[in-house]
Amino acid sequence: ESVSHDIGKTRIFTNLSLCVNKNEKVLILGRSGLGKTSLFRLLLGFEQAGSGKILVNGLNLDKAHVHQIRQQLFYLSQDIDLRDETLNNLVTEIWEFNFDRKLSRETIEQLLTFLELSPGILEKRTGDLSGGERQRIGLLIGFLLNRPIWLLDEPTSALDNAMKKKIAEHLLSLDKTMIIISHDHCWQDSSAVRIERWS
């Protein structure tokens, strides 16, 4: 609410107000340099606003609540950064970390099938993945973590058109709150999203 933000001497935005309701899907459109990614960094507590108030599920985004808020968020960055390890190790860590529900190996295999990834990809190291594979593994991590709020920065940019449409339709059907930054028409053409145009 009424958030202003600077990086160095550069003003990113002034008096920004944005309300996203539970399970709502909001698509932010606008050219580069308008602060769309900075909005995500503010919500994650990686950057601090110069003025204004940020609330996430009723919690004020401050040092006292930032860890609690991050536990509610899943962030898929445009350039997803994965530790250099095998995907099997990465998935196992997430599996063991997720205390909210039981994750079976069958569930993971079903997700891989949906993402059109073979089970053998789990033997690959993260550094050996193509751009499209990295993006789909990022989405796999999101499904496994099962957080209530998703921040998606160009989540389908490296995928072909058929996969873009498949992923967008599925994500928009989930009972999740989502803020999406994307130039892909699969998001813009959906009636399930509220479009915010920044200029």
Q: PLM features: residue spans?
A:
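Helix-to-loop junction immediately C-terminal to a conserved catalytic motif
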Residues: 44
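Conserved ABC transporter NBD signature motif
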Residues: 52-60, 69
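Q-loop/switch helix immediately C-terminal to the Walker
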Residues: 79, 84-102
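Conserved ABC ATPase "signature" region
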Residues: 103-121
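Conserved ABC ATPase signature
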Residues: 125-129, 133
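Hydrophobic anchor residue at the start of the ABC signature
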Residues: 139-140
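ABC ATPase C-loop
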Residues: 143-144
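Catalytic Walker B motif of ABC-type/P-loop ATPase nucleotide-binding domains
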Residues: 150-154
